[in-house]
């Protein structure tokens, strides 16, 4: 089996994490997984949703979108259609769930963190790139809150990151690009903590059912890739 990119089965794409990419947000990152590029910002607002008022804890929510020409053909803006699509809603909920798992909300004070992930170029793995980049932007936003004296302690419990794995031409592969993803028999998106715990595993057999041993092989690939991604996050956060 030869991957279209020429990468080994267990090889990540080239990953770059550029901090402070925009001027105004408390945390901002440009994350690049190969040709997939996502701008991730984290904005802080005082106050929490109504269901949390008076409880002394914070909240985090996420939104996800793509530029119309992030893909090979132009897509209509969801705003012009008047509603978000099911895929968009699914992805932004995944991003929010994943990042909330990194935090102790009781230490945030009554502040809301708004995570915005905007795909400027898509070549597969946009949701996993979004989670990975947003984690770094989130840490920068928490530093701002700490300087303001808005925190009630250390809210960061753990780092998180995400990566895709799949079965391509009968073999498990790591970090699928669009050509692989569109032809894969199976596609998994895996979210993990830096302590090795799983937060979420989303999987679909598109071509043929996958066997337990293939599932375990994909998880092992994800763990290997994740270890490398956590090191890249750590390196990006060095001031």
Swiss-Prot record:
Gene encoding the protein: rph
Indicate the secretion signal residues: none
- Residues that coordinate or bind phosphate: 87, 125-127
Q: Which EC number(s) are documented for this chain?
A: 2.7.7.56
This protein's assembly is summarised as: Homohexameric ring arranged as a trimer of dimers.
One Gene Ontology term of the molecular function aspect: tRNA binding
Q: Which CDD domains match?
A: RNase_PH_bact (cd11362)
Give the species this sequence originates from: Ectopseudomonas mendocina (strain ymp)
Catalytic reaction(s) noted: tRNA(n+1) + phosphate = tRNA(n) + a ribonucleoside 5'-diphosphate
* Record's function text: Phosphorolytic 3'-5' exoribonuclease that plays an important role in tRNA 3'-end maturation. Removes nucleotide residues following the 3'-CCA terminus of tRNAs; can also add nucleotides to the ends of RNA molecules by using nucleoside diphosphates as substrates, but this may not be physiologically important. Probably plays a role in initiation of 16S rRNA degradation (leading to ribosome degradation) during starvation.
Q: What family is reported? A: Belongs to the RNase PH family.
Q: Name one GO biological process term.
A: rRNA processing
**Keyword list, A-Z:** Nucleotidyltransferase, RNA-binding, rRNA processing, Transferase, tRNA processing, tRNA-binding
User: What is the protein name stated in its UniProt record?
Assistant: Ribonuclease PH
């Amino acid at each position: 089996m030869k991957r279209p990119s020429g990468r080994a089965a267990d090889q990540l794409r080239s990953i770059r994490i550029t901090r402070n990419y925009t001027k105004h947000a408390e945390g901002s990152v440009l994350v690049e997984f190969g040709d997939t590029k996502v701008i991730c910002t984290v904005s802080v607002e005082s106050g929490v949703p109504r269901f949390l008022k008076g409880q002394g804890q914070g909240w985090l929510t996420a939104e996800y979108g793509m530029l119309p020409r992030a893909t090979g053909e132009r897509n209509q803006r969801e705003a012009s259609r008047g509603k978000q699509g099911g895929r968009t809603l699914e992805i932004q909920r995944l991003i929010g769930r994943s990042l909330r798992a990194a935090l102790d909300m009781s230490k945030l004070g009554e502040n809301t963190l708004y995570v915005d992930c905007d795909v400027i170029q898509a070549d597969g793995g946009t949701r996993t790139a979004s989670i990975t980049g947003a984690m770094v932007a989130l840490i920068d936003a928490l530093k701002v809150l700490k300087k303001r004296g808005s925190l009630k302690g250390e809210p960061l419990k753990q780092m998180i990151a995400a990566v895709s794995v799949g079965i391509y031409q009968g073999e498990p592969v790591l970090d699928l690009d669009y050509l692989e993803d569109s032809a894969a028999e199976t596609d998994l998106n895996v979210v993990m903590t830096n302590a090795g715990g799983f937060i979420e595993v989303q999987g679909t057999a598109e071509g043929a059912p996958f066997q337990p041993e293939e599932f375990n092989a994909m998880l092992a690939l994800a763990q290997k890739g994740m270890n490398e991604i956590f090191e890249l996050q750590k390196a990006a956060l060095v001031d």
